[in-house]
Amino acid sequence: SCYNLMQMTPEARQALLKRIYSTTEGYGVSYARISLGCNDFSSTEYTYCDTKGSESDPISNFALYSDENDYVIPVLKEILAINPNLKIIAAPWTCPKWMKVTDINTKNPKDSWTDGHLNPDYREVYAKYFVKFINVMKEKGINIYAVSPQNEPLNKANCASLYMPWQEEAPFVKKLAAQFKKNNLQTKIYVFDHNYNYDKIADQEDYPVKLYNAIGDNFEGSELVVGAAYHDYGGNNSELTDIHNQRPDKELIFSETSIGTWKNGRDLSKRLMADMKNVALATVNQYCKAVLVWNLMLDN
């Protein structure tokens, strides 16, 4: 989206961004979701530390990629100038490949952008990777309001992905919250970030609730683990009410849907009606505090 926006003239881009984000001259959109590293719409697969550093500092090679420097950050700065209260949530599609293993018991390396598990030995290092990202973005004038530990943690097949069932996300979330606390970060953590039907994996049903129960409420940074995020690529949105009823103390947000095609405008009204019913109203009426769609601006 940011690449496409940067292909516009500055005047046209400014007019469009005002139409979307301005609270006085536009729709007042107040939340944006970005990837922490590459996503399935990026120019290529990458993370911010593709080459491992020394054993004493494995993420010493951390650096933002050109996608962020050339497109994402400039666009975010323009949006923030229009709406300074914009909230930004970031999620990784994959960790660096050198942190991946085929399974957490044998810990055999997994040299692939797709699938794999986070090596338990690198949970703390990966948490520090998040901290570096948040601090670097802050230096650029961009505050990261929230993160999720992993985009679609039950999706093994995405071009950039990491399999992270609740049994593995739970201990990582504790490391992540502790690192945020130690570094005086107020960044919120939304767990899960995937479908209503948990990709039909039996022991992953009610993923957020199982994760909350596993980590408990008495650990460093526990107050930063505020809720769960959902997508709608499988299952029924009634799952939102079910999760709320089990843990009414935790927030819910709806963090991703792809709203499909409009057939050059022929199906626009039908599409907008369906999106209002299923994406907007069905989520906020079932306890979601935010609704985000994916992607903002594609060229095809």
For each predicted feature, which ranges?
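N-terminal catalytic cores of secreted or lumenal carbohydrate-active enzymes
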Residues: 1-144, 170, 174
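Short, solvent-exposed loop/turn and secondary-structure capping segments
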Residues: 6-8, 43-48, 99-104, 158-161, ...
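Short amphipathic alpha-helical segments and helix-helix/interface helices
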Residues: 17, 73-77, 177, 240-244, ...
